[in-house]
Swiss-Prot record:
GO terms for cellular component: cytosol. The active site is at residue 74. The lineage of its organism: Archaea, Methanobacteriati, Methanobacteriota, Methanomada group, Methanococci. It comes from the Archaea. This is Putative gamma-glutamylcyclotransferase MJ1514. InterPro entries: AIG2-like_dom, GGACT, GGCT-like, GGCT-like_sf. Coiled coil: none annotated.
Length: 120
């Protein structure tokens, strides 16, 4: 089993959550330990080399099959690139989880690091 940190369309209440994560164990809400930059250009994405804000999201425990399905959705490794990062859960616990990064910035900067702020 692996942990995956989701910050956009895979979060609960967004369009990709049910098809991909409805049977996965919810671990908790949290944010990245390090700062990154979130942009939206139709869909949200995070850029690793810009240090703007902590990215807000949710952690799920997923099996290998689910992780491969998410890799396919995200176009890993050709479109998004998956990397393990430290996540601080709202409980205060720190865990390592996969996060999908995009290689370049374009679109609208989400300064808060929370896609829900952008979506209203």
């Amino acid at each position: 089993m692996e942990y995956v940190f989701v910050y956009g369309s895979l979060r609960k209440g967004f369009w990709n959550h049910e098809p991909y994560l409805k049977n996965s164990k919810f671990i908790g809400k949290g944010k990245t330990k390090e700062k990154y930059a979130m942009y939206v250009n139709i869909i949200p994405y995070v850029v690793e080399n810009e240090k703007i804000s902590h990215i807000v999201g949710e952690v799920y425990e997923v099996d290998e099959k689910t992780l491969k399905r998410i890799d396919c959705l995200e176009g890993h490794p050709d479109y998004y690139r998956r990397k393990k990062v430290s996540i601080i859960l709202d409980s205060g616990k720190e865990i390592e989880a996969w996060l999908y990064f995009y290689p370049e910035s374009c679109g609208i900067l989400v300064e808060s690091g929370d896609y829900k702020d952008y979506r209203g």
